[in-house]
Amino acid sequence: MLVSSSVLKDDSSLRIFKESPNEFEYIIKRHDMDDRKEDTESKERRSTMGSSFIRFGRGQSFFNNLDNSAFDNEIDSKVSRHPRWKSPDIVIRFGRSGMKSTNDEQPKRGKNDLNFIRFGRNIQIVPTDFDLSAVCSALMSNDAISDAGLHPDVTRLFRLCNNLNKITGEISLDSLETNSNHRE
């Protein structure tokens, strides 16, 4: 839907940009704000590149409403106060990238990456690079098959592999079913 440096337009005056170097960052800009110059201090107010949160608000303290002059010195005079219909650009970052690479190796997953992404309760989505035939062959070559008291999830996985075997003929689990019938 969004390609690097592409613009997604709607009926309002907003533009949504996809930043190419970071896959988790989008920038929303207003049409008439493109020529606005930004100083470095306003950029520092935004969350830094590695952050995983979104800052909301307009940078104004609640002390602005007080008449006490002692608080006037604490309020930053460089805060730009745009009207709501001409607010500055909004940068939204969706978490951090968990892919790490060392030297010339393949990218590695970070310790916080999930193998399954859960949407709702007990609904799992398997990653796209999941190779079930490799899992089934690894389970068959494992010595844990002969052990009594397999976990119910493992037996379900064996049944799935057996059903795939009937379709493809590549994996043989008939001996497992024979062994499981003798245990019962």
From Swiss-Prot:
Tissue expression profile of the protein:
Expressed throughout the central nervous system.
Query: From which domain of life does this come?
Result: Eukaryota
- The answer on whether this UniProt entry bears the keyword Iron reads no
Q: Please state the span of the N-terminal signal peptide per the UniProt entry.
A: none
GO biological process entries: neuropeptide signaling pathway
Q: Which GO terms describe its cellular component?
A: extracellular region
Propeptide cleavage-removed residue intervals: 1-44, 59-83, 97-107, 122-184
Q: Where in the cell is it found?
A: Secreted
Residue positions where Phenylalanine amide is found in the record = F56, F94, F119
Q: Which UniProt keywords apply?
A: Amidation, Cleavage on pair of basic residues, Neuropeptide, Secreted
**Coiled-coil portions:** none
The answer on whether this UniProt entry bears the keyword Oxidoreductase reads: no
| Known function | In insects, FMRFamide and related peptides have modulatory actions at skeletal neuromuscular junctions, and peptides that are immunologically related to FMRFamide are released into the circulation from neurohemal organs.
Task: Please report which protein family the annotation says this sequence is part of.
Answer: Belongs to the FARP (FMRFamide related peptide) family.
Identification of the protein by name: FMRFamide-related peptides
**What organism, scientifically named, is this protein from?**
Camponotus floridanus (Florida carpenter ant)
